[in-house]
Amino acid sequence: MHIAFRVDGSLHIGLGHIMRCLTLAKQCMDEHDVTFICSELPDHVESLLKDSVNTLILLDESQWLTCNDKLYEIESAENVNKSTVHSSMVLSKQAQQKQARNCIAKLQIQSNTPPDILIVDHYQLSSPFCTAMRDYCKHIVVIDDLANRSHDCDVLLDQNLFENTNTRYKGLVPGNAVLLLGPEFAVLKEAFYQASTEITVKPTLQSEQDIPLHKSNHILVCFGGSDPSDVTRKVVAELSNLKSYSFTADIVVGGAYAHVDALTTLVAKHNNMTLHHNTPSMPQLMQKASFMIGAGGSMHWERAQMNLAGLIITIADNQIETTRYLHQRNCCMWLGESEKVTSEEIRKAIEFALNSPEKISDIANNARSLLNHEQCSSYVMDTIINAITR
């Protein structure tokens, strides 16, 4: 089959959507042709996709988005999640239809075979885009987590967990659409499945002396591929101030992180910290850690797979609802939003985690229990294809 992805990534919106789709693509590339359709990308991401997928199509926004089209609209529906409306700047119907025509034209140039499946992972696109693409693509799959606009799709995937997970898309998708909801359908890289086979569930610890030596007071810090608010440096600054604690830390930033030089200078002052730039070894770094300070989003499920507790600072609006719910269920510690959390709150949370290993162990075990650890790494893509071809 020919499987196409419509997805974007940038310093501003982050790289999570791109990496999620690339993970899905790698689950099926042995048997299917994969095309990515993207707007302008950071250079290193463009190179990554060119090396990873069969075809990369880059869209020129100037060909389909005029000044008059830069008006946005949020569709009204009875159960639209009002708390996330401001997170999604949905393109007007006219702009979405123009973009669909542009995508079809580009696809026709690149291949004589229309996509059998189009997977759309994009907050600015909704039903008008998908309906227009149906003229050329056999099946439509949408990846979403906002539930704030309608989708004309055959399958909808939302890997996140909410209090109303099973009802939040009512009225927003066709009645016959297959819904793949919750962390059972978490999209994880093959490396996390491989590394997690070496993980055993942490016992509930009775004292600080019971911590396994290789996990003792070792902190992992990571806020994704771009970290536009530079929360990483804020956290490292607080780690620097913890003079009375003995710990080590791995600090991880992605290829789109814009403050590498300043962070390198800061980390170099501390022999108990190691900086990793655009590392492929996140599962191994998670294996080493006692706990992690990081963002929400897909990293919730990576930590859960690796049985690692998270102290979470949300860096995007779409991370808040799931993180709040996981915090309520004692599956993570939510410190707050990146723009609002204070240095004192970060420091106190780190001190709590270092002083309370048994409570951190409970959080890790609770999060791990949300996932199905028996399924194979291609489970999500296999389920999508089976749902469409059944």
Mark where each language-model region is.
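A short, well-ordered alpha-helix in the C-terminal region of glycosyltransferases
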Residues: 352, 359-373
